[in-house]
């Protein structure tokens, strides 16, 4: 997902366009008509905020034995990312089947986790990678493409 855009809205849109999730949304009778997709379910109130809608979908996914991996490339400390991280903390606290794989510069991730309401990120598992070895990449390309 793109951290320069509204991540919760983007996640909800991606869930609604995924074949597996659409089936879950329909079977759970989750009314997403407020967001411009889905159908109105008779007798059901539409969900009017993204976080609540995502929680409802994740709860149904959990009942169906499904899990969700969210990937974010180039994490930055902006309002969209802060709101998403706060919501992600709620998803995890509610033991929902959601996982996050985020990449970015150390400085950007450090700045984000230093936000006073996002310090839970310090406790999250992290794997710090070293820079790629240019010579190894070059040799691999030579091997793959039979370059002498």
Residue ranges, per PLM feature:
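P-loop NTPase nucleotide-binding core
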Residues: 1-70, 75, 97-98
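Sensor-1/coupling segment of RecA-like P-loop NTPase cores
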Residues: 62-64, 68-71, 77-83, 87-118
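A short helix-turn-beta junction within AAA+ P-loop NTPase domains corresponding to the substrate/partner-engaging
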Residues: 114-132
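Alpha-helical scaffold elements adjacent to nucleotide-binding pockets in ATP/GTP-utilizing enzyme cores
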Residues: 3-14, 83-87, 111, 120, ...
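Proline-centered turn/helix-capping motifs that create local helix->coil transitions or kinks
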Residues: 20-23, 113-114, 137, 148
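Conserved nucleotide-binding/hydrolysis micro-motifs of P-loop NTPases
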Residues: 2-3, 77, 105-110, 132-137
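Conserved small helical "lid"/interfacial subdomain of P-loop NTPases
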Residues: 129-148
